[in-house]
Every structure is written in structure tokens, then in C-alpha cells.
């Protein structure tokens, strides 16, 4: 039996690099050789035991790779050696939710959020992709892994916060938390034409990045009363749309208080424990406010559209990948990411350490990055 290297969840606060069986595709499935993946905040929740997955599962849900093997029925759609990504959400395209356009809630046997949740994920040398016809998106020529590695989850999720909030041209928008998802939500607000974009975070370095990604005002809650400032800037009303991108009671409550009557709070955070909406924050339920939640849209067409924005220079996500590690060094990488050290935003993982070494060697020689259009 062929084996591969993978990071296996063993139980709360315990992951290990192990040799496990390499997957074999059935009809309609594909096996990818993973070239790049990342660590996500949801992975931290899983390892800490805050989100239930079974011990023995390979986690990770942001795959970039090369097609290693195709199951029957895919020969005319893809080819071995083709560079592709798959979304963190893998819709089947046939169930009630898929047919009604809510792909993230797919109820297909292997649809919805499955990678690193109910089926083996991307922290491995190889990944089995179900319903490959609906989920594998070819990477456009000229794009590197680092250009697109955030498309499967972070970019799609952040952008969906702006989409679900139904931001209109000229709206005022406040984005609470400027981590990778919040920064992509800030970018989404800019792309949708918001006139006032307020980035909120307690980390000044992240606020500086928020300005680059579209915020024209930034607020640090350690220095100002954020809700009062947002209301002051919006003639006392509050923002038309607020986006909560952290998943904590405090940020959810502040976002709610900063949302004007008739406005929308778009919630992107993954919450654990009880979430409370104080009655005065929702004007005793009389303010015509909307609270919407969303899980990152996936599927082949969503991935194609996200990569199109990158390939045309409309979007540059490379600055969000701040650290790189070999998959073998997952413990060091996970500790840095989970403890938010060294200005980390996103950590890229490389199952093939030689590829990472070659990248570092190129950087040491002063290899020039491709020129990008300004945001």
C-alpha cells in the first residue's frame, strides 16, 4: 500500500506528523498532490477542542495542488499534472441547498464543509477531492501558489461578508477585526463601492494593512470608544453595514451597537460558547436590523471568479501570506499562528520542503516578485 505524510489530529491539543495510506480516487473523484496549503483560525479551534472532529482525521481545508490521479469520468475535463485549487466548501451541485444557490450548506454525502471536518483534509502530501467536476478549478497561467492559496477559504469568506451584507455603492461599512478574513472583507467593501470603510482592530500593524486593503479610517479600541466614533462619523446613526470577523462576544456586541437602525450586521466569526445580543444593542428588537451569517462559498465557479480577480490585477493577496513553513515543521508553525506572534497573518505550509528551500534561496538571491497593479 502506498503511503503519504500527513498531519493527523490525535485529540485536544495534539497533532502529529504520520505516515498514512495514500488515497485512491473512485469515479468522479480526483487525487491532488498538495503543493501549498495554509493554517486557518478554524484549524486552531479544532486542535484546541473547541470544534468537534474525530481523532485520526487529517485536518486543513485550503488546498492548492497538482492533479495526481483522476477517477473515471473526468478524463475530458482535467488532466494529470494540471495545477488546480479546490474550495474549502465542496458542493455536490445536486441537493436542495445546491439547487437553491446555498452551496455552503450542501447536504450531499461528501458536500459542504468536509475537508478537515468529516473527511481527510489538506495538511498532507495528497488529498482526495470528492465531486471533482464541481470543485476543481484550474489555476490561470501566470499565477503562483501564493497568489491563490487564500481563495479556497479566506478570500471567499471575507468577500462573502461584504456580499451577504449587501453593501451598496456609497454605503458606510465598519469591519471589526482585521485578521486575514477581516482584511478580505475590507477589500470586499471597497470592491462593492462603499464610500466610508472603517477598519477596527487592536493591532496597529493590522490597521496599517487595512488601509492598504481599502479602509479610509482605522480605529483601535484600546485608544478610542469605537462605537461612539463610528456613530460620530455617520451623523449619529451608525454604519449601514458592519462585518464581524473574529467570533467573540465583545466584537459581535460592538458591531451590533455600531449598526444603524435598518442596517445589517454580517457575521463571519466562528463562535464557541453562548452568544448574547443585549436588548439595548438591538433597540429592544424594534430597529429593523438584520443579522446575517455566512459560510465561505465554494465550488469550481466561485474559485474561478476569485482567481480571475487576481489574474487581472484587481486583487493581490500575497501580502497576507506572512510566514512559510515545511509541513514537517507544523508544530512550530501552529504555535506561531495560534499565538499570533511575529506579526503573522497567514502561514503557508509546503509538504515538499525542497520547494520551500528553493523559494528561500531565490529570495536570498534577490529574485524579483512579479509586478502587481496597485489595489
What do the predicted segments below correspond to?
Residues 165-169, 192, 208-290, 351, ...:
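Glycine-rich cofactor phosphate-binding loops and adjacent beta1-alpha1 units
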Residues 94-176:
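NAD(P)H dinucleotide-binding glycine-rich loop of Rossmann-like/cofactor-binding domains
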Residues 10, 21-22, 54-60, 115-120, ...:
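Short Gly/Pro-enriched turn/cap motifs at secondary-structure boundaries
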Residues 81, 138-224, 228:
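Mid-domain Rossmann-like dinucleotide-binding core that forms the NAD(H)/NADP(H) cofactor-binding site
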Residues 21-37, 50-99, 140-142:
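Glycine-rich beta-strand-centered segment in the early N-terminal region that forms part
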Residues 1-4, 253-257, 299-375:
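C-terminal hydrophobic helical "lid"/dimerization subdomain
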Residues 203, 271, 297:
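Residues in the short beta-alpha loop(s) of Rossmann-like NAD(P)-binding domains
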